[in-house]
Amino acid sequence: GAMSNLEIALVADGVKASGAQAGGDLLYRKMEGAGIDRALNKIKALCTDPNGGCVFWNAGAQPPELLANGEVVMATGWNGRFFNAQMEGTPLVQVWDAQILDYEYFAMVKGGPNDANGEALKVLREMTSSEGLAGSAKYIAYAPWRKSSIAVMEAGEPWYKDGKTNMVPHMPTNPTNLKSHILMNPDYWADNQ
């Protein structure tokens, strides 16, 4: 879909990703008015370039597969899928410049099961604690949002479940990987789907 492809196209056309860190202000302002046309024109130019072309994917496993079989020389995709391919021996290198950070939300339904007895809140607190968020990164390369979780991981490296792999370098929220990024703006996309 358009989400993330338009952001990537604007960066490819010269808009600085680093201006998009605070909720996407600069980048998302550029998408107003002629910005959408600018992004679409960049996508068209990339897709019709005689030295390039585009393959659009619709399943998370496709980008590393396309790279591994030589059908494409670069791809966008989810870092966890690229990490898994690397762990399976595929010679891939992730580039973090202008990465797009998106996040998920936890929600508790008022009046739902375990609301009255406090169990739901207890679980939510544990899941979002520094240790709880870091714990999930033992199994998948999707990053915790808390800086304190990265510190927990650094102190416990090698962090990955195999007991050999340092995970912090593979985290999108590792400070080294955050030098130039786009923070997905859910408000923009809620208003412009």
How does the language model describe each region?
Residues 48-113, 150-159:
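Extracytoplasmic/periplasmic substrate-binding proteins
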Residues 10-17, 46-51, 71, 79, ...:
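Sec/Tat-exported extracytoplasmic proteins
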Residues 6-10, 40-44, 64, 76, ...:
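Non-transmembrane alpha-helical segments in soluble domains
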Residues 1-62:
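Extracytoplasmic ligand-binding site segments that recognize negatively charged/polar headgroups
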Residues 109-178:
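Mature extracytoplasmic/periplasmic domains
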